[in-house]
């Protein structure tokens, strides 16, 4: 498993300090593993995303971190302390739920102050922290309003302020943008990241939204059937997936099957049933004789070519079956001679670009050798 060091801002690997260590954590229900022997290290100040489809185990893992579920096996270490058997109210951890769970009868400032009052902090300290949080989330002028008088984005900021007011060592976010519309969600993702980075709190978030994870997190763990499929930075997971599952879960991808045909100095040549012409991949790809592999190719790596490439590029010929115009780009769905469907993306850089293929046209698709990622699992 690639437990890669995160991409820190103005930090070196030496400066990173582990905060949360998950050691062989398992949670079983009736003999079925919801979380299956996972291990992970998260560093101070890191924003980390657990990403996966419904039922993959990500929410169960988050609930174990919060203390709402007891592990069947394994340890949860926070700053060197084993929290596995510590009740939720004694953990230096706060959780922000998708529904925000604001008290409807309380004002904004009363909601933010609630946890501080439960901890019996002095009134002056409570007032100081509430004012600090109101300023942090830019909600000073809404301090006297109640939740029903706020927009969705404002309610989210209040919930975040309440979670940060107690100055937790670890903040947990459960589908933080799930209740927002797309435009507001896109804006709030950047706003929340900015707030978390200014505070410096370590954060673990759960989401099924790949764009949300890639926008907000420094590292991502893709989960499937209770296990980590791949851990890494967003760019690493997208450009260098280690399994077919992670390649298909993040973004769009074309997948070809192939078997090694020939080893050349500048690359490996594969026979692929989906392609008329041999498929060439990097020479250092992990390919064994007579063992089938999958080759992943992102749609944006494919070019439309008028003539066969002369520089050793891969190419295929097919018929345009459908075109999806998405504003900034168009997606061409092409049926190859073999019958396999692949998609190619073309940026709409010019408002009125002539000569582009349309439905029913025969097109030639080209892609570089290093655009192919060979997957053995």
Swiss-Prot record:
GO terms for molecular function: ABC-type putrescine transporter activity; ATP binding; ATP hydrolysis activity. It catalyses: putrescine(out) + ATP + H2O = putrescine(in) + ADP + phosphate + H(+). One of its GO terms (cellular component) is ATP-binding cassette (ABC) transporter complex, substrate-binding subunit-containing. Residues 20-250 form the ABC transporter domain. InterPro entries: AAA+_ATPase, ABC_SmlMolc_Importer, ABC_transporter-like_ATP-bd, ABC_transporter-like_CS, Mo/tungstate-bd_C_term_dom, P-loop_NTPase, PotA-like, Transp-assoc_OB_typ2. SUPFAM superfamilies: MOP-like (SSF50331), P-loop containing nucleoside triphosphate hydrolases (SSF52540). This is Putrescine transport ATP-binding protein PotG.
């Amino acid at each position: 498993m690639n437990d890669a060091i995160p991409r820190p801002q103005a930090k070196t690997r030496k400066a990173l300090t582990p905060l949360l260590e998950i050691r062989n954590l398992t949670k079983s229900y009736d003999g079925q593993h919801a979380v299956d022997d996972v291990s992970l290290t998260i560093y101070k100040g890191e924003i980390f995303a657990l990403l996966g489809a419904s039922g993959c185990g990500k929410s169960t893992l988050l609930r174990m971190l919060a203390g709402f579920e007891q592990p069947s096996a394994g340890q949860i270490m926070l700053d060197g302390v084993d929290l596995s058997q510590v009740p939720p109210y004694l953990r230096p951890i706060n959780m922000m739920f998708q529904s925000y769970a604001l008290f409807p009868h309380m004002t904004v400032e009363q909601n933010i102050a609630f946890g501080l009052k439960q901890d019996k902090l002095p009134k002056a300290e409570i007032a100081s922290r509430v004012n600090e949080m109101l300023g942090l989330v830019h909600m000073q002028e809404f301090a006297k309003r109640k939740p029903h008088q706020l927009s969705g984005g404002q309610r989210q900021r209040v919930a975040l302020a309440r979670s940060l007011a107690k100055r937790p060592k670890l903040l947990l976010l459960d589908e933080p943008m799930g209740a927002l519309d797309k435009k507001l969600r896109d804006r709030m993702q950047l706003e929340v990241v900015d707030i978390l980075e200014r505070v410096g709190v370590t954060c673990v978030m759960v989401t099924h939204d790949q764009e949300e994870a890639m926008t907000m997190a420094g590292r991502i763990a893709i989960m499937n059937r209770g296990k980590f499929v791949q851990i890494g930075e967003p760019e690493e997971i997208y450009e260098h997936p280690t399994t077919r599952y992670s390649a298909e879960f993040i973004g769009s991808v074309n997948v070809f099957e192939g078997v090694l045909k020939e080893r050349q100095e500048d690359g490996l040549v594969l026979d692929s049933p989906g392609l008329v012409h041999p498929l060439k991949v990097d020479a250092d790809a992990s390919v064994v004789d007579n063992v089938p592999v999958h080759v992943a190719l992102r749609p944006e790596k494919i070019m439309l070519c008028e003539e066969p490439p002369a520089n050793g590029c891969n190419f295929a010929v097919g018929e345009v079956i459908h075109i999806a115009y998405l504003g900034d780009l168009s997606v061409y769905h092409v049926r190859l001679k073999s019958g396999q469907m692949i998609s190619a993306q073309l940026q709409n850089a010019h408002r009125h670009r002539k000569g582009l293929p349309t439905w029913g046209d025969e097109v030639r698709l080209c892609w570089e050798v290093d655009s192919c990622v060979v997957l053995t699992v």
